[in-house]
Amino acid sequence: MSTSDFYLRYYVGHKGKFGHEFLEFEFRPDGKLRYANNSNYKNDVMIRKEAYVHKSVMEELKRIIDDSEITKEDDALWPPPDRVGRQELEIVIGDEHISFTTSKIGSLIDVNQSKDPEGLRVFYYLVQDLKCLVFSLIGLHFKIKPI
């Protein structure tokens, strides 16, 4: 699979008393990682970072996604975005293009109480893995604490 067959974007955020607070990252086909973290808490400023990652990182990302089997899931029964917030995950991998939208998930309790706990659990753990990878890449590359 060539890198031109791959794209990933994740967003989680809400609009509250501190304005629009969100975390967003994307991996583009050319290996560019774009990261944005906006928190207005105590007048924090938005953190925006961009870096190129090696082909091996992109291959590992694809492996994580393939292993998760997220492409077999459907968000039809997942909780819709609400005042607490929203999450979006978009993936292009090979000839598949999938997009998921759901509310923010606080914990596995929220997952287990949903109408599709098995599918939402796949999403929940994949997002945890992706965030961990991105925070590590950003932290190592820029020597900052992403959150």
From Swiss-Prot:
Signal peptide: none
Cross-referenced SUPFAM superfamilies: Mago nashi protein (SSF89817)
Cell cycle listed as a keyword: no
Keyword check for RNA-binding: yes
Principal localisation: nucleus
Pfam families: Mago_nashi
Gene Ontology CC, one term: nuclear speck
Location of this chain's protein in the cell: Nucleus; Nucleus speckle; Cytoplasm
An individual GO BP term: nuclear-transcribed mRNA catabolic process, nonsense-mediated decay
Function: Core component of the splicing-dependent multiprotein exon junction complex (EJC) deposited at splice junctions on mRNAs. The EJC is a dynamic structure consisting of core proteins and several peripheral nuclear and cytoplasmic associated factors that join the complex only transiently either during EJC assembly or during subsequent mRNA metabolism.
Similarity annotation: Belongs to the mago nashi family.
PANTHER family: MAGO HOMOLOG, EXON JUNCTION COMPLEX SUBUNIT-RELATED, PROTEIN MAGO NASHI HOMOLOG
Protein's recorded name: Protein mago nashi homolog
Gene designation per UniProt: magoh
